[in-house]
């Protein structure tokens, strides 16, 4: 099952750094979303890749980290 992992950061700089690390680790940009107003990063990943994505996001000190099943628009 595909998951949407969301990390909320206290600053846009932390969010940008997390986003950039996901890109550098090979996550496709079309599966990433950076919300500059709320300083959130969302990544859509297969369940098997969820722990790795969460580890990357956690390295940047999020205020909150959550995951939920991905819902197609």
Label each region the model flagged:
Residues 1-73:
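Positively charged, small/polar-rich N-terminal and surface patches that mediate targeting and assembly
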């Amino acid at each position: 099952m595909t998951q949407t992992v969301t990390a909320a950061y206290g600053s846009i700089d932390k969010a940008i750094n997390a986003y950039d690390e996901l890109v550098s680790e090979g996550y496709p940009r079309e599966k990433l979303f950076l919300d500059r107003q709320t300083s959130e990063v969302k990544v859509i990943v297969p369940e098997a890749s969820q722990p790795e994505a969460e580890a990357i996001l956690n390295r940047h000190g999020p205020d909150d980290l959550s995951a939920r099943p991905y819902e197609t628009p």
